[in-house]
Curated annotation (Swiss-Prot):
Family stated for the protein in its record: Belongs to the class-II aminoacyl-tRNA synthetase family.
GO cellular component terms, A-Z: cytoplasm
Pfam family, one: tRNA-synt_His
NCBIfam families with a match to the protein in the record: hisS (TIGR00442)
Name listed for the protein in its UniProt record: Histidine--tRNA ligase
Subcellular location: Cytoplasm
Oligomer status and interactors: Homodimer.
Sorted UniProt keywords: Aminoacyl-tRNA synthetase, ATP-binding, Cytoplasm, Ligase, Nucleotide-binding, Protein biosynthesis
EC number: 6.1.1.21
One MF annotation (Gene Ontology) recorded for this entry: histidine-tRNA ligase activity
Entry annotated with the keyword Protein biosynthesis: yes
Amino acid sequence: MTRPSVSTFKAPKGTYDLLPPDSAKFLAVREAIAAPLRNSGYGYIETPGFENVELFARGVGESTDIVTKEMYVFETKGGDRLALRPETTAPVLRAVLEANLHKAGNLPVKVWYSGSQYRYERPQKGRYRHFSQVGAEAIGAEDPALDAELIILADQSYRALGLQDFRILLNSLGDQECRPVYRAALQDFLRGLDLDEETLRRAEINPLRVLDDKRPDVQKQLTEAPLLRDYLCDACKAYHEEVRELITAAGVVFEDDPKLVRGLDYYTRTTFEFVHDGLGSQSAVGGGGRYDGLSEMIGGPSLPSVGWALGVDRTVLALEAEGIELDIPSATSVFAVPLGEEARRILFAKVTELRKNGVAADFSYGGKGLKAAMKAANRSGARYTLVLGERDLAEGVVQLKDMESGEQTAIGVNEIVAELESRLG
């Protein structure tokens, strides 16, 4: 049998490979989102890329598109039914419960994560079957200040990246006291509309999901739909107003969106979304909200919680839409070019020493000639290049070239590390 060549294989439909130099931009976005979280008491958490199917069926909601249409589900040889994670909030809560972190006496448990999610969706720009998110969860406390904190931190992340053209949409979904009354009123309204059979079925299971339907013909019929804010109980009204006051006092601009719902069933009270108008139909770059009942839905105790997830892929698209170029330092500061075997041995040792001292250094591999090696040095983005030839060896020096100014200086071989550390600060 003839083995296929490597070029026969391509990334699966709806996925992409993240390659240098573009990957540096994605790493910078992840770091910009994570930095304010680390500065605010959030510890890093990592969960498996797959979980028990029932975790998502119970937590995300059996009637959601994610569970019914979009999950990658498989059965192990041992008979376990698992799913690649379509989102990470339910897995994070599962991990916290399993490790009994909620019993350590220091609530809320504040954690952040970064990782891949998988959904079988129709691929288009900004919507992939494999995508990356950075998320944050504050588990075990019912406090408007926590909701406000997370919204403020996400806003801070985007501002740090230089983004300006994003909007924050805010709403309250009520709680177990007032939402059932609204649910019944919304169902009565939806039954009187000209909706397809699938949408009517969804309206009976979870009518709030119909409000999230993006089809123009459905949205047109929803213009007179009852609004949840008119059904909020006094406690939910007071809670939501405090969230609004706290983020306003922090200088965060937001828009009240009474029809905002999220695509996951576990949200209660505060819900919010970050949208960017430069992304077309896939305008949401992130979102989240409060999920006070999720712990009980997956078999745990009552643990009111709040969190969000921001899409790394869509944030990068938002940066491109605004024409923002991130100031990403070169991955290499020094590039070494040996000309000959003895020079190769000496410079390789110096590059190793530079790296041990924290200097980002690379080496011309493959026995390239001077011209090809200098092209590689240029491509690396290195500030300085070290060139060591036979004449230099005889004199005990190396040529140090400043790639910005073009200035070239001969320095002693034994002075390389100290000289470069001094120049690079």
